[in-house]
Swiss-Prot record:
Any one GO CC term of the record: membrane
UniProt-annotated location(s): Membrane
Family: Belongs to the SPEC3 family. Stum subfamily.
UniProt source species: Homo sapiens
Membrane-crossing segments per the record: 51-71, 87-107
Gene giving rise to this polypeptide: STUM
Name of this protein: Protein stum homolog
């Protein structure tokens, strides 16, 4: 994966500060460090849904593993966006269906149930963060 233009600017700014410091130690003044979470394709396919829908999916995932994830797959077809903008809607839909099947099939050994609950919590967290972005409020999660 190639670094973005912003990453290159951040690295260049950090290198300039390090070069300007005669002691060789880098100073953090004037340098903006951006931290981004790297997500795999299954996790990046979790849709940004309205908060009530995300809470319903969390409850469904809590009581019937994979059901909330299955429902969330259909929100992608209804226009919910994901962190996979370069993938087609059908591909993201099938990624969510695959995540639901993994959760259902591995629920027997409790792994799927735990994964399903965490998946639902991620849906709620994404819904909350999306709400903050739409309102323009700085967020602290």
């Amino acid at each position: 994966m190639e670094p973005s233009h912003k990453d290159a600017e951040t690295a260049a700014a950090a290198a300039a500060v390090a070069a300007a410091d005669p002691r060789g130690a880098s100073s953090s003044s004037g340098v903006v460090v951006q931290v981004r979470e790297k997500k795999g394709p299954l996790r990046a396919a979790i849709p940004y849904m309205p908060f009530p829908v995300a809470v319903i999916c969390l409850f469904l995932n809590t009581f019937v593993p994979g059901l909330g994830t299955f429902v969330s797959a259909f929100t992608v077809l209804c226009g919910a966006r994901t962190d996979l903008p370069d993938r087609h809607v059908c591909c993201v839909f099938w990624l969510n269906i695959a995540a639901a099947l993994i959760q259902i099939l591995t629920a027997i050994v409790m792994v799927g149930w735990i994964m399903s609950i965490f998946w639902g919590m991620d849906m709620v967290i994404l819904a909350i963060s999306q709400g903050y972005k739409e309102q323009g409020i700085p967020q602290q999660l």
